[in-house]
């Protein structure tokens, strides 16, 4: 084990930036051998320079840029190697899909939307009772017939259905939704020995009439509906931005690994062309 890495100083960072401006990104050995920068960067390896430059690049862009600057891949370096020391060949990286912790994927459910929307969705799924689930259009059509809702409610409905599915309150089958079997088959116990009175499906209940009247005449409820739609849109955009950031970081890492392999291949070719014997020693990939 080597000595512990020291924290980068501002002088070393300035020297690294100046070296990249002079020789370009990826020319870490050339920057180290440059008399202008070697006194300052003598204690750093080419891997240290590469990692530090990546951190500086991400810090400058804030990981939020839609265009990722991929370092230019150049040809083999013309500087000869004076020794035939074993060449360290980094092991191949294992790229896996970025996953979030289970707690991070769960979005807050309480206090964000009005309680009656969830009840309206549950009522629609219970009445439709499709074995393979009902799609968003069918659920929206049922609710629109029962209650006076705005046309923008459909956009909010998709977000609400995803939340209910994430919280295991409903089941998602492809692009359709249905109630769990435990809820779909649950029947209330009778209050007395006589058979319960059947409701006429064509006549909405008193609660439904009250909700529909309130929805059509209350400016406060319309404002709450518009705010809920904006919240749902913001959450969807934030999720898409996070996915794009993770994909950009993955592509940037792939470009760096490709550049490293090209540098190693160029050095192997340079040594073999001079008749030197090159030994490849695999090393374990560091975890980032």
From Swiss-Prot:
The keyword Phosphoprotein does not apply. GO terms for cellular component: chromatin; chromosome, telomeric region; nucleolus; nucleosome; nucleus. Residues 230-250 form a coiled coil. Residues 28-56 bind DNA. Gene3D superfamilies: Homeodomain-like, Winged helix-like DNA-binding domain superfamily/Winged helix DNA-binding domain. It is found in: Nucleus; Chromosome; Nucleus, Nucleolus; Chromosome, Telomere. SMART domains: H15 (SM00526), SANT (SM00717). Residues 1-42, 62-87, 181-206 are annotated as: Disordered. GO terms for molecular function: double-stranded telomeric DNA binding; protein homodimerization activity; single-stranded telomeric DNA binding. GO terms for biological process: nucleosome assembly. Residues 1-60 form the HTH myb-type domain. PROSITE patterns: H15, HTH_MYB. Residues 113-181 form the H15 domain. The keyword S-adenosyl-L-methionine does not apply. Keywords: Chromosome, Coiled coil, DNA-binding, Nucleus, Telomere, Transcription, Transcription regulation. InterPro entries: Histone_H1/H5_H15, Homeodomain-like_sf, Myb_dom, SANT/Myb, SMH1-6, WH-like_DNA-bd_sf, WH_DNA-bd_sf. Residues 76-87 have a biased composition (Low complexity). Belongs to the histone H1/H5 family. SMH subfamily. HTH myb-type domain confers double-stranded telomeric DNA-binding while the H15 domain is involved in non-specific DNA-protein interaction and multimerization. Forms a homodimer and heterodimers. Binds preferentially double-stranded telomeric repeats, but may also bind to the single telomeric strand. This is Single myb histone 4. It comes from Zea mays.
